[in-house]
Amino acid sequence: MKAEFTVKLIEWNGNNNHRSMPWKGERNPYKIWLSEIILQQTRVEQGWEYYLKFINRFPTIHDLAKAPEETVFKLWEGLGYYTRCKNLHATAKFISQTYLGKFPSNYNDILSLKGIGPYTAAAIASFAFNLPHAVVDGNVQRVLSRYFGINTPIDSPSGKELYRELAESLLDREQPGIFNQAMMDFGATICKPRNPLCNVCIQREDCQAFQHGWVTMLPVKEKILQKKSRWFTYYIVRYGEQVYIRKRSGKDIWANLFEFILHESENEESHVQAQTIKMIEKIVGDNFFKIESISPFLKQ
């Protein structure tokens, strides 16, 4: 069953996988790494444009490493999750200095780099260096869960290990990069989270979820993410044509980004804080100022 799955997948990839992406088939580890970091928490359609912008602006790791942090952050603007960008820049500097700009070709060395986890390390190792390491992302987990009829939660420790071992056992060790790309593309275009194309699926005869009517029930997730509400009040200080901004301190996801004066309150009944008024007075000096409020808005 496992061998047949792999054979059919590779056959589908060669004949029917028409998914096009600018990094697909790439063997340059720098470009593969860049694409994988951009695609973390980002849809392919959005990441495509940013990938091309980064490659055009920073053709090599040395180019990225030499760039000022503000320049890199500006190019990243709009993607969110700026920790990815910070790690990307830090790792580029490390590779430029430690490896003289040559991306490490050993899986464990790749995995040790800042901002790179098992999935990204496996992607780089298999796509760039043809090393036999299976990638396991949400697409892969979904395909495996449905095909084998597995109801172990994909986000549980035992589930993560189970899907990793299963993916490794299916891996075509002669062409791991092709297998990995095929698995991800199959999950993204055929075995989709919603409205999967079971009617054209080459695996449906052996797919346990299809045969037993479990498709909409798999995969299973253990955790339900709890949304946290935060209330921010921003103070936009204008003087003529100038606007005051400052670099954010601290170690949160927005560290080193620029912002207006910010006060975070415990509830939405926010009010002007005395310390904030003093801060504004320090900025504007003896000049007269007034505070005008605007309607609140929700950001999710």
Label the model's feature ranges.
Residues 216-263:
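N-terminal strand-loop-strand
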Residues 256-298:
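The catalytic Nudix box helix
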Residues 1-7, 268-273:
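Short, Lys/Arg-enriched, disordered terminal segments
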Residues 221-224, 294-300:
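Short, solvent-exposed loop/turn elements at beta->coil junctions and helix N-caps
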Residues 2-199, 203-217, 229, 287-289:
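Catalytic cores of DNA base-excision repair glycosylases
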Residues 192, 226, 267-271:
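A short glycine-/small-residue-rich loop at the edge of a beta-strand within enzyme catalytic domains
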Residues 27, 43, 128, 249-250, ...:
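Structured beta->alpha junctions
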